[in-house]
């Protein structure tokens, strides 16, 4: 399935250990994280846009904010790429899984910071983030739970969701990003929001982002299509 990744500025690739990635995939292949967003694809994004810690060159690991963690695919990618990760997600069940991943794989060279809250309510530290990267929920297409904290429950109408969830999430990314930082959103038009891609770009420009590029990202197939 092709999804559009929309980006708002680039770097060198870091060689990901194949044995490490295989270990991660074996450990968590029973969850939806691997099929929902491949850790390998996430790791490549981090390799492209984030610095790596290097005592030799005096660089520190970059920081990414995953605004909608889901089942942890991007978290696993951040672990493999050895970068700092901030994650937000309101779903109780998936959040427990994210905490288990952190417990199993947290290392000395990276920080993993998890918050059980919707991204539209989370205030990151100002100018502290290098990359904001996620696949936002497609309104009520992705229902991780029936909890009232879910964005489709809090904002039950499409326009309310766009104004209340999507706009405020993109705005808080702008607050947290460093100058020259990147916002990368994996979005696609859906039956419920037929112009989702256009709306996302419009909101970002209104908030003062500069639209740099749009990529086509090949993801593993999922049940149904948005």
Language-model segments: residues:
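Class I S-adenosyl-L-methionine-dependent methyltransferase catalytic core
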Residues: 1-226
């Amino acid at each position: 399935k092709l999804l559009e990744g929309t980006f708002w500025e680039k770097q060198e690739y870091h060689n990901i250990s194949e044995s490490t990635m295989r270990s991660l995939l074996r450990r968590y292949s029973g969850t939806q994280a691997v099929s929902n967003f491949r850790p390998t694809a996430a790791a490549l994004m981090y390799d492209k846009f984030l610095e790596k810690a290097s005592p030799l060159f005096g660089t520190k690991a970059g920081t990414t904010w995953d605004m909608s963690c889901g089942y942890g695919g991007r978290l696993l990618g951040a672990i493999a790429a050895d970068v700092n990760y901030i994650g937000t997600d309101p779903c109780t069940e998936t959040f427990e899984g994210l905490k288990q991943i952190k417990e199993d794989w947290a290392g000395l060279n990276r920080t993993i910071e998890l918050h059980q809250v919707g991204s539209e309510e989370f205030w990151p530290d100002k100018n502290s983030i290098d990359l904001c990267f996620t696949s936002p929920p497609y309104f009520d297409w992705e229902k991780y739970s029936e909890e009232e904290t879910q964005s489709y429950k809090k904002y039950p109408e499409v326009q309310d969701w766009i104004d209340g969830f999507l706009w405020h999430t993109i705005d808080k990314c702008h607050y947290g990003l460093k100058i020259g930082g990147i916002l990368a959103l994996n979005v696609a038009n859906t039956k419920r929001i037929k112009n989702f891609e256009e709306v996302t770009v419009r909101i970002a420009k209104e908030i003062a982002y500069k639209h740099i590029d749009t990529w086509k990202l090949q993801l593993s197939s999922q049940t149904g299509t948005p």
